[in-house]
Amino acid sequence: MRFFALFIYRPVATILIAAAITLCGILGFRLLPVAPLPQVDFPVIMVSASLPGASPETMASSVATPLERSLGRIAGVNEMTSSSSLGSTRIILEFNFDRDINGAARDVQAAINAAQSLLPGGMPSRPTYRKANPSDAPIMILTLTSESWSQGKLYDFASTQLAQTIAQIDGVGDVDVGGSSLPAVRVGLNPQALFNQGVSLDEVREAIDSANVRRPQGAIEDSVHRWQIQTNDELKTAAEYQPLIIHYNNGAAVRLGDVASVTDSVQDVRNAGMTNAKPAILLMIRKLPEANIIQTVDGIRAKLPELRAMIPAAIDLQIAQDRSPTIRASLQEVEETLAISVALVIMVVFLFLRSGRATLIPAVAVPVSLIGTFAAMYLCGFSLNNLSLMALTIATGFVVDDAIVVLENIARHLEAGMKPLQAALQGTREVGFTVISMSLSLVAVFLPLLLMGGLPGRLLREFAVTLSVAIGISLVVSLTLTPMMCGWMLKSSKPRTQPRKRGVGRLLVALQQGYGTSLKWVLNHTRLVGVVFLGTVALNIWLYIAIPKTFFPEQDTGVLMGGIQADQSISFQAMRGKLQDFMKIIRDDPAVNNVTGFTGGSRVNSGMMFITLKPRGERKETAQQIIDRLRVKLAKEPGARLFLMAVQDIRVGGRQANASYQYTLLSDSLAALREWEPKIRKALSALPQLADVNSDQQDNGAEMNLIYDRDTMSRLGIDVQAANSLLNNAFGQRQISTIYQPMNQYKVVMEVDPRYSQDISALEKMFVINRDGKAIPLSYFAQWRPANAPLSVNHQGLSAASTIAFNLPTGTSLSQATEAINRTMTQLGVPPTVRGSFSGTAQVFQQTMNSQLILIVAAIATVYIVLGILYESYVHPLTILSTLPSAGVGALLALELFNAPFSLIALIGIMLLIGIVKKNAIMMVDFALEAQRSGGLTPAQAIFQACLLRFRPIMMTTLAALFGALPLVLSGGDGSELRQPLGITIVGGLVMSQLLTLYTTPVVYLFFDRLRLRFSRKNSKPVVEI
């Protein structure tokens, strides 16, 4: 009593406390960063190594394996995967959430240093690492185009100057430049001319390397001057290399230009990038795992004027893709939804109370509670994102509940003629315990979420804390500011003048009278109600098992990502044509705004595309509908497939795949994996629950297998090293020398001129100079035959791995897909030497599925413990929790009705319902216990009176929560995929719960009271309850 009086009789102090909470919240709001979702990125580091010309198998065994053995010893590694292709190895290290990315980077560098002695010689550089996840979609893509500059020159400018500047911006983790390669001097050898002159390829290589050196020459000085010595020991352009003497044939000088074409070209000619059908250089910018995407994008945009100022006029720099506009639009939609929810909740209060003054009280309590929450969010390091703003939207209905309960009880005393200050004090005292019970039990629901680990726990923690803080502030406001405002703003009414008898009040009285009549009938037919209650319990179990499930709602971010997979024997020229064909098909779609793509590098038969869709307001279809439409057109392209998927704000794992979900096969036997992977992939492709099934196992690439006759080689005076060096010189794009320039270093690349290597007959023109100086044709000591070889070799951990990726057809849930895969694997009878498991998002979904029921049970148990402590009773918490089955039925039926799968967002809705619907029972039980204790009523009389007295606040709080969630259901636009499942779950659960719990709760109350009496008689011990 004294606590409440302290605030009621000191209005200035109470107002200033509320003002302080509001001001702190406003300051916190201005400082909060903006993001699509809470920070849930796993720390990921990518290690890259290269050995030009080495086969995928050689890269896997000689480069990947030594690095993996060293990197695998690092503490906190959650998953390690590697992919080795022609001349390139990439290892992805995914760390635990609690691992600091900078500390992990130091450990990675130490592991690379430790493995250095085990790596093969001839690597052009040491392995490097980047603190970025290559499987993440870029947050921004910049393109460089020019009518006069070559692609190599553009690439050089982009990688040397632009990429370096962008990489220094806070939050940027990696700037990947694609579409070409660095400039280089290319030496294209003529095998016939070399043979005629008696010049070996090694001789050419050594001559070029010897002629292009950079060594210190020293200085000369006398007593007065000092002269630094500088020579023309470096050759920098193709024109300088052409007259280079590489051999003497019968005293005549043989120059490089006599036996080769020497051109200023690029280091790797098998690269191509395009934007909207124009050749382009792409700068794909990815953020650091812990960086904020909006702040990073804003930093890049702020730097663009400076970047454009340093770019020559002949270059055009454009933003091809930016993920921030859809994120900002989504957050704006949530903020509008929040405002609508506040307005609807206040409207509900006004309709019930029909008083401007009375309505003003919760109208003040709601913003104070919500705004004050921003201060706590800032102190906790949170951001303004879809989930935290959704928490505040839902909190609108919660925070007004406390004020409504207090306000309604005070208004009831005022209507009975009590003076305002006395009514405020008496009314607050009566419901103070009720409000505390409601708030503490609601916060208790979220305690298991705060203890939940992994990605789901990290994702939901921000939602749970934000909502709990809002409820906590609301509790304080409802017991301090609300009664003070009631005492000083409201007026007493004459006992017989009941304003509720007009308009909505008359309807409410009629409803209350009808409820009283029906409740009497129900209390006389408790067995029927008991059957209904048990039926809802059983229906919950059946619906939960039957409803389709997924991990997270499929988002429409306005960005699509596509992976091209062509025939494994395709040439680069043909692959570039496929890229152009696919880009034309997509560019012609009316919903597409921009298309960029690239192909080449170490994987000639693959490519990537990034598609920016028009804003949601300018197109009718969702991203998935656009993918379905494009899939039909893209399937008509022969010799290659383009797999499209919508970019999501959450992507789990560092494994790159051509679809949203992955199933990984592991084996210690590469042969077993290659035998079973095609069988499994074929079986999964036939499943109607899967779409776009593809695999990263590519072991049917065309290979020419050369078989040396070692006896003949020995007789001819040729060793294997000389033969292998010949092949590397001729066909490996061998980097034989380095050109040093002020801004960068460039390579001299040697190979047989492509004009002379169009087919296998090029091998017949190859020759080796033996120990006697004679030219011996390759065909004299080697035979060749066509064979199949892998284009890539993949590992997970230290096991051979193959990942089958898949998308979901429209109308199929992830649970249906995973069940179909598990069933198919069982039917195939896969041997134990081949192990299968889900990866990435599908793996997290499986883990979440296993913990969902445990989480719900833990939440219910926590609420039971809190209520048991508050009521000092084992029984009354069970009565209160009896409201949950009906809410669960309503939520699951609503999801089925709207064809929405049960996702992590729907799970949040179920958790919220556990906290919401028990409020009705708390209000009933509190008043029933008080009536029994002070009024001497029987349990039946007490619960009946409690139901009638609390009918109005129950209706008000339920409708407030319902209207607070309704905008989430009706909202459209960006981000609605996240909001709607939460709103559907809450609205469905509230409607069903309100219909049933008004009757089941009093019946359960009486059932447990009778049970308590029977138990008391048997034990002859009094049960003390408050």
From Swiss-Prot:
Any GO CC annotation of this UniProt entry: plasma membrane
Molecular-function GO terms, alphabetical: xenobiotic transmembrane transporter activity
Keywords, comma-separated and alphabetical: Cell inner membrane, Cell membrane, Membrane, Transmembrane, Transmembrane helix, Transport
Location within or outside the cell: Cell inner membrane
Transmembrane segments: 15-35, 333-353, 360-380, 387-407, 431-451, 463-483, 528-548, 853-873, 897-917, 953-973, 984-1004
Domain of life of the native organism: Bacteria
Annotated membrane topology: Multi-pass membrane protein
Gene3D superfamilies in UniProt: Multidrug efflux transporter AcrB pore domain, Multidrug efflux transporter AcrB pore domain like, Multidrug efflux transporter AcrB TolC docking domain, DN and DC subdomains, Multidrug efflux transporter AcrB transmembrane domain
Keyword Transmembrane helix: yes
InterPro entries reported in the protein's UniProt record: AcrB_DN_DC_subdom, Acrflvin-R, Multidrug-R_MdtC
HAMAP family the record matches: MdtC
Family: Belongs to the resistance-nodulation-cell division (RND) (TC 2.A.6) family. MdtC subfamily.
NCBIfam families for this protein: PRK10614.1 (NF007905), RND_permease_2 (NF033617)
Record text on subunit structure and interactions: Part of a tripartite efflux system composed of MdtA, MdtB and MdtC. MdtC forms a heteromultimer with MdtB.
Protein name, UniProt field: Multidrug resistance protein MdtC
Higher taxonomy: Bacteria, Pseudomonadati, Pseudomonadota, Gammaproteobacteria, Enterobacterales
